[in-house]
Amino acid sequence: SIHRVPLKKGKSLRKQLKDHGLLEDFLKKHPYNPASKYHPVLTATESYEPMTNYMDASYYGTISIGTPQQDFSVIFDTGSSNLWVPSIYCKSSACSNHKRFDPSKSSTYVSTNETVYIAYGTGSMSGILGYDTVAVSSIDVQNQIFGLSETEPGSFFYYCNFDGILGLAFPSISSSGATPVFDNMMSQHLVAQDLFSVYLSKDGETGSFVLFGGIDPNYTTKGIYWVPLSAETYWQITMDRVTVGNKYVACFFTCQAIVDTGTSLLVMPQGAYNRIIKDLGVSSDGEISCDDISKLPDVTFHINGHAFTLPASAYVLNEDGSCMLGFENMGTPTELGEQWILGDVFIREYYVIFDRANNKVGLSPLS
């Protein structure tokens, strides 16, 4: 049983805010802090996710909750573990223009007295936990615990073109100890294999998907390179080094990287970011003339003995003729040392398999 969820690529939040003349003000009020997602969990009921890196494009798909079904657009996020959607209890402006779950309309809903709190780079979500049937593609997950938001402070969610988030990372980082959706799919024997795979299309193309329980052979014709996980928290792997052209620029003594579909850019430590933009000859804000793309060198990630190369066409984002690097600087170092986030800029170049049975990530080159 293999189940495909098509993903839509949303207009970037950066562009929507720019169109409304709100970008500068937004960035002042919400300084970008990607590190907040990956900081050690402060309390058992808190986990971090980078809502801000949904600044660029986001890929989202539809799920349904309840009986009869109520539909929601969610980001399938391999960098977090909770499922949550807005609820009718939410009076924040962000909830007013999104779909809201109404538990009184579902005959299968079971309430709890538990609360959930999730902090983001730009704000936080707090709410209550409940149980219901969650339909993902043709899979009905019974008794799935999920968050019903009561507050979504800040204007951030207001402009997002998705309603909630479905986390696909490990139970160990789930806020309030809530069992993640994929863990229930496995324990309820709803998938043929204990893995899922992700294809994210390039600019403007359709066809992105998450496939639960299988690998689509049409996307693995160039072979699959398997990388063992270094931790069962995020989908975390060890990188050997990073090169620009043939020059060794970062990750000198190996470093940790997280493969994160919920982060649109490629996030790296401050020192690495400074060295890379210097080597690329790009200004510190990452803006670049679109005419220069052809002159830029490849950036290569050496992982488990294999070179994974990003050409400039992959790491430079062109939005309506203005170009910027798809790299972001992590800012504060995490307790995990030098950490990288391989977001959508990286994932678009590979068909990625997230294998829970063997705790590995598989990467198959797409071009």
Swiss-Prot record:
The keyword Magnesium does not apply. Keywords: Aspartyl protease, Digestion, Disulfide bond, Glycoprotein, Hydrolase, Protease, Zymogen. Glycans are attached at N113. Residues 59-364 form the Peptidase A1 domain. Its EC number is 3.4.23.1. Disulfide bonds join C90-C95, C251-C255, C290-C323. The active site is at D77, D260. One of its GO terms (biological process) is digestion. Residues 1-42 form a propeptide. PROSITE patterns: ASP_PROTEASE, PEPTIDASE_A1. One of its GO terms (molecular function) is aspartic-type endopeptidase activity. It comes from the Eukaryota. It catalyses: Preferential cleavage: hydrophobic, preferably aromatic, residues in P1 and P1' positions. Cleaves 1-Phe-|-Val-2, 4-Gln-|-His-5, 13-Glu-|-Ala-14, 14-Ala-|-Leu-15, 15-Leu-|-Tyr-16, 16-Tyr-|-Leu-17, 23-Gly-|-Phe-24, 24-Phe-|-Phe-25 and 25-Phe-|-Tyr-26 bonds in the B chain of insulin. It is an enzyme of class 3 (hydrolase). Shows particularly broad specificity; although bonds involving phenylalanine and leucine are preferred, many others are also cleaved to some extent. PANTHER family: BETA-SITE APP-CLEAVING ENZYME, ISOFORM A-RELATED (PTHR47966), PEPSIN A-3-RELATED (PTHR47966:SF22). Belongs to the peptidase A1 family. This is Pepsin A. It comes from Gallus gallus. The gene is PGA.
